Amino acid sequence: MALTHDHLQTDTIAAIATAMSEAGIGIIRISGSEASAIGSKLYRTSKKQKTDISRWRPGTIRFGYIVETDQEGNENVIDEVMLSWMKNPHSYTTEDTVEINTHGGMFLMNRILELVLGAGARMAEPGEFTKRAFLGGRIDLARAEAVMDLISSQNEFARKTSAAQLQGAVSEKIRELRGKILYEIAFIESALDDPENYSLDGYPERLMDTCLYLEKEMNDLLSRAEEGRILREGIRTAIVGRPNVGKSSLLNFLTGEERAIVTEIEGTTRDTLSETVRVGGVLLHLTDTAGIRDTEDKVEQIGVHRAQQALENADLILFLVDSSRELSQEDAQIAERIIARLDEGTNCIILVNKSDLSSLVTEEEVKSLFLSRGRECPALLFCSLQTGEGIRELSEYVAELFHTGEIAEKNEIFLTNLRHKDAVKEARDSIRLVEGSIESGMSEDFFSIDLMNAYRVLGTILGEAVEDDLVEEIFSRFCLGK
């Protein structure tokens, strides 16, 4: 069923809104009809006098003390605080809200939270403050989800796209598309109900133009969704090559730590090893893999299989070739696997390692691994993991490959939420069905069915006509205090 304001809870909730660690400042947030009363019970002015917080001018923050009253009626100061008061509906949750800014010790914050709960508040559930903002109508569901995305962002692209979504960029685009769909639905219904005043002559052609526009806009959103996912979550990067070409050395070099064992013995790496690093401003989820080759060793076979899986799932492949050894059949077999991935849009960079040693491999020979199979050779860089030669060029090329600087300057809308992507995809498919109905010469009432579905599905992104269970599941991912 659709959510309404009737679902708003009347009890008052509280939680620590800052990180659960020692810091200069910690915040205890209280929201609900009893927020001011609870705050007034515990807060004393700078002169240690009682005050009715509800009489303060909304948006006020004042210095004072949080006190605990013992059994004899004596008030003991717990901490000096700054207390802010926000009157409904002009608060984060749209409810009366009190925030206690205290010193950020974990014991101290929990102690004050205990007093707040003892004064009548209930412990908030994860994401409940933002959920109340959604139920109160201050933000739609897409903007509510952006709050958690912003908190969990790990790079500038993720921060920027989350901030744009929080400000309503995604919501505005979805409303624009829904508005065009609703206009067509209303016109068809009016024409069917009142044919004397609404003519359908030539209408299918005009509707087709609208559908083609809608399909293009949705396709644009979907095409940028995968790009957005990669840049937001990081690039799944597989380091592949035959045994002992320097894969583990590359992982160690990029992480700045001795994460992988490096020896001259082939097959040292028996399993995949993952680390996350930033290269060229891009977050790479690196996977060091076992050398891909035919082997009778059962344990190494498992490692080779996992290496092949990492290659299959990668957004970026770093293919290492040893310049101090001649190319082998193993190099050729790996190139064949990479070509299959290139055909599916995966990126690849070839790193010809050990350039500080006498080379037995030419650039043309490496390129021939791909050219001889009718495929253009990916970017090729010479490097030395002993001297660091070529690593700067690698960073620059990764940044260029994923053009993060270019994207950062654009105001494009990116769907970074899988739920949103699935909804747009379903809506796009419904629009295609309308196009098919027009081409088949079907009557106008058939158009409305699929138009209505597209309108409804896009509405779920905003939180319209969504089930309670979905809302509960979304907000359960949030942290306490948000």
Provide a role label for each language-model segment.
Residues L286, L320, L351:
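Generic enzyme active-site microenvironment
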Residues M1-K160, A164, G168, R341-L342, ...:
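A glycine-rich (often HGG/GG-containing) alpha/beta subdomain
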Residues I30, T102-G104, L254, T289, ...:
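Glycine-rich, N-terminal phosphate-binding loop of Rossmann-like dinucleotide-binding domains
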Residues E300-S324:
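Inter-motif core of Ras-like GTPase G domains
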Residues R62-D79, L83-K87, G267-T295, N313-L316:
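Switch I (G2) and immediately adjacent beta-strands of P-loop GTPase domains
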Residues A2, H7-I16, M20, E156-E275, ...:
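C-terminal-of-GTPase-core extension/linker across diverse P-loop GTPases
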